[in-house]
Regions:
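Sensory modules in modular signal-transduction proteins
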Residues: 1-13, 18
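PAS-family sensory domains
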Residues: 1-3, 27, 64
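Short loop/turn elements at sensory-signaling interfaces that couple input to output
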Residues: 12, 83-98, 104-107
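PAS/PAS-like sensory domain cap-loop motif
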Residues: 24-35
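PAS-family sensory/regulatory domains
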Residues: 34-47
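PAS/Per-ARNT-Sim sensory domains
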Residues: 45-57
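Soluble sensory domains of the PAS superfamily and closely related sensory modules
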Residues: 58-63
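PAS/PAC sensory module
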Residues: 65-70, 75-84, 89, 99
Length: 111
């Protein structure tokens, strides 16, 4: 995953960052050491937190649909991404988190 051309970001059941590849940190304009252990919602604009929480809850249930989202880079600018999130479960079926792949997207008004 470290050499993946897209950003890869793994969050646990509490939405804390447990893994990210270099590309994900690069997309967000930050470092891996700054990302690991941080709440994933720290990379959102306040107006997007409620929608992100809803998507997180939907992904817990295994919804496979990709979605487009806006993230907040370290410098405060917007990053528009297409996200494919996959829920992670242990052998007993308990939800453990989500692995997401993130690719650059254009804002809807630029399409």
């Amino acid at each position: 995953m470290d050499n993946h051309r897209d950003g890869v970001w793994i969050i646990d059941a509490g939405a804390q960052t447990t893994y990210a590849n270099e590309r994900m940190a690069e997309l967000l304009g930050t470092s891996l050491s700054e990302m690991i252990g941080q709440p994933s919602f720290a990379y959102l604009f306040p107006a997007d937190v409620e929608a992100a929480q809803h998507l997180f809850d939907v992904k817990k249930g295994g919804a496979p649909n990709p979605f487009r989202f806006r993230l907040r880079k370290k410098d405060g600018s917007a990053l528009f991404v297409d996200v494919q999130g996959t829920p992670l479960h242990d052998t007993a079926g308990v939800f453990m988190g989500i692995v997401g792949t993130f690719s650059l997207s254009k804002p809807l008004n630029e399409r």
